[in-house]
Curated annotation (Swiss-Prot):
<dbReference type="Pfam" id="PF00146">
    <property type="entry name" value="NADHdh"/>
</dbReference>
<comment type="similarity">
    <text>Belongs to the complex I subunit 1 family.</text>
</comment>
<keyword id="KW-0813">Transport</keyword>
<feature type="transmembrane region" description="Helical">
    <location>
        <begin position="67"/>
        <end position="87"/>
    </location>
</feature>
<keyword id="KW-0496">Mitochondrion</keyword>
<feature type="transmembrane region" description="Helical">
    <location>
        <begin position="103"/>
        <end position="123"/>
    </location>
</feature>
<dbReference type="GO" id="GO:0009060">
    <property type="term" value="P:aerobic respiration"/>
</dbReference>
<keyword id="KW-0520">NAD</keyword>
<feature type="transmembrane region" description="Helical">
    <location>
        <begin position="256"/>
        <end position="276"/>
    </location>
</feature>
<keyword id="KW-0999">Mitochondrion inner membrane</keyword>
<keyword id="KW-0249">Electron transport</keyword>
<feature type="transmembrane region" description="Helical">
    <location>
        <begin position="220"/>
        <end position="240"/>
    </location>
</feature>
<dbReference type="InterPro" id="IPR001694">
    <property type="entry name" value="NADH_UbQ_OxRdtase_su1/FPO"/>
</dbReference>
<dbReference type="GO" id="GO:0005743">
    <property type="term" value="C:mitochondrial inner membrane"/>
</dbReference>
<keyword id="KW-1133">Transmembrane helix</keyword>
<feature type="transmembrane region" description="Helical">
    <location>
        <begin position="296"/>
        <end position="316"/>
    </location>
</feature>
<dbReference type="InterPro" id="IPR018086">
    <property type="entry name" value="NADH_UbQ_OxRdtase_su1_CS"/>
</dbReference>
Length: 321
């Protein structure tokens, strides 16, 4: 293998991990200000080095395995979670994707579905009833909300004319799809909150019920891997939301401007994730499921039929001259 072929993926991975580190600092700062306190402000200027101190602490701690755990799956689950979270960035145009695929959207949906295996493995291999119940909740929640995500993606494909993420950037040169499909965007954004197990849908870690959920038995570096995977998924989902609904136009002469515009919009969406966490209480589990199956599913199916039927009905009209 040519050594130059390793450089772009390595740069992408390092950039994602650095972004995750500063995202955790940003979250703690925003949560602090919303709760009328300062947040981290000791380690480094303005507390910016706090994530690196936390990471160093977790890496240097001793790895402890529960006595009755299944060691192979126990270690494999967080590793698989982080590997999948990093691999899902490959088809995203920023501005040039690492893997320019014709079915990039389908690949992202398929790989996000594989994340449930890491949740299930971690809960089952921990041999703890709290971890297993948290894993079952996470799996049910993730699989359920992927139904809505898939239907909304189908609606976007009908409007853009292709499964390629590059096609979406070309389609949105004259007009953002968010303006034409704002109900779908609102449901997509809410579904990404549930897909990433974020508040107010963080049912996997109810402190009074399941303590920390599927990762309750984890500590040291495996816990850090789960933590990195969670925040990498948050940034990925918001970057995908930007590409689907708010994509900058195709870069022609300054690709750096495309990247800056894309990541600025993704950062604003990510900050609204943190705003939602500070503002809303946790849903009950039955409310979470009713929201999807009784509200989002009928609405997304109706919008999908609307997006497919309106263009076909226009074909029968006489030419507008």
């Amino acid at each position: 293998m040519d050594s130059l072929t390793i450089v772009p993926p390595a740069l992408l991975i390092i950039s994602i991990l650095m972004a995750v580190a500063f995202l955790t600092a940003l979250e703690r700062k925003i949560m602090g200000h919303m709760q009328l306190r300062k947040g981290p402000n000791i380690v480094g200027p303005l507390g910016l080095l706090q994530p690196f101190a936390d990471g160093l602490k977790l890496i240097t701690k001793e790895l402890t395995l529960p006595l009755l755990a299944t060691p192979t799956l126990f270690i494999l689950a967080p590793t698989a979670a982080l590997m999948l979270a990093l691999a899902m960035w490959s088809p995203l145009p920023m501005p040039s994707p690492l893997a320019d695929l014709n079915l990039g959207l389908l690949l992202l949906l398929a790989m996000s579905s594989l994340m449930v295996y890491s949740f299930l493995w971690s809960g089952w291999s921990s041999n703890s009833k709290y971890a297993l119940m948290g894993a079952m909740r996470a799996v049910a929640q993730t699989i359920s909300y992927e139904v809505t995500l898939a239907i909304i993606v189908l609606s976007i494909v009908l409007l853009s004319g292709g499964f390629s993420l590059h096609t979406l950037t070309v389609t949105q040169e004259p007009l953002y799809l968010a303006l034409a499909t704002w109900p779908s965007m609102m449901m997509w954004y809410t579904s990404t909150l549930a897909e990433t197990n974020r508040a107010p849908f963080d049912l996997t870690e109810g402190e009074s019920e399941l303590v920390s959920g599927f990762n309750v038995e984890y500590s040291a570096s495996p816990f850090a891997l789960f933590f990195l995977a969670e925040y990498a998924n948050i940034m990925l989902m918001n970057t995908l939301t930007t590409t689907l609904f708010l994509s900058p136009s195709t870069p022609t002469f300054l690709p750096a401007l495309f990247t800056i515009a894309l990541m600025s919009k993704a950062l604003l969406l990510t900050m609204s994730f943190l705003w939602v966490r500070a503002s809303y209480p946790r849903f009950r589990y039955d409310q979470l499921m009713h929201l999807l199956w009784k509200n989002f599913l009928p609405m997304t199916l109706t919008l999908c039929l609307w997006h497919s039927s309106v263009p076909m009905s226009m074909f029968g009209l006489p030419p507008m001259t």
